[in-house]
Amino acid sequence: MAEILIHSTSSTVIPSVDPHQVTEVDLPFRIMKLLDESHPIIHKEPVHWQFGVNPDPKRMHDVMIENMVYHRGLGLSANQIGMPVKVFAMRVDDSDNAIVCFNPKIIKESDETVMMKEGCLSYPELYLNVKRPQAIEGTYQNADGDEINVHFEGLAARIFHHEMDHMEGNTFLNRVSRVFLQSARRKQKKLLRKGRQNGRTD
């Protein structure tokens, strides 16, 4: 398992829900529609979250966690569910801990990089080999507006880095070559076609 160092104790225990069984009625917060790559919000840089102006950051925190769980993601950005603000949720390890990052920033990236296959909720069945830093140092505000400093390694660094792409109006498509993307798109079409034939809807 990849080592993950977290210089923060402000994580949230993810509710124990089975995403295969949950319905909107079971969740205490409204589930938002997941936007796919065709929506312009995905490709536009979100605006900063303004504490004292934007409504109820603690409710926003909970909505982000619930939607990440419902949509079965390792991370989820607010613009992926129709809210163009710089906020994302992410799992910080392979247990039930998660954080919600308001106005996140990357301060430093390691020179060491890792190539790894990853996906994105807004691009169903598309998997790309993406090179990202092995470790990052970052900062974000929690729901109380406090600034939190973090150091992530391994998978957590990759998730934070992936979600930061969304914070700039970019996606993981911007990190691969056109030739590789064309090949991955062909595989995506086959997987989507197979899913429809098998009656899958997710």
Regions found by a protein language model. Name each.
Residues 1-202:
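Positively charged
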